[in-house]
């Protein structure tokens, strides 16, 4: 509720708000949640609808969008593992909840997210727009605000890589292996699967 309220408030201020959600991953989310956003002027796109008739001939239950990506004004990208539901957004130190009259510990999950600023944000912006286009989302106002000119930030090298069900090049895997092979002091890796 708090998240949708914030999106609607920003939309009310004239901010363009576009949301892609995975159909299968959001089965437990009430349809009213997305309808309320649509009614408030948010552009909402269902990724690969679970209904094969609605999805069309290329439907596959395993063709999912697992990205968690927040883009702000083409200048900031926040990405990682957090989802928009209680277990994920509550954190691992969440207070107990009451269920069926009993006090139970909240099953919070450990999540990792990063914030990126600088030219690499354009790569993440392009990944979002490519997905929007492939999923046949409504036309967006693709003004210059999507890709502002950004100067370098920091000293790290950041590259936006994406994959989808049609990818056959294993670019993410190849890049991870290459990065690990080039390590000289340490490797830190977090991956859920």
Predicted features along the sequence, with ranges:
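Charged, low-complexity intrinsically disordered terminal segments
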Residues: 1-193
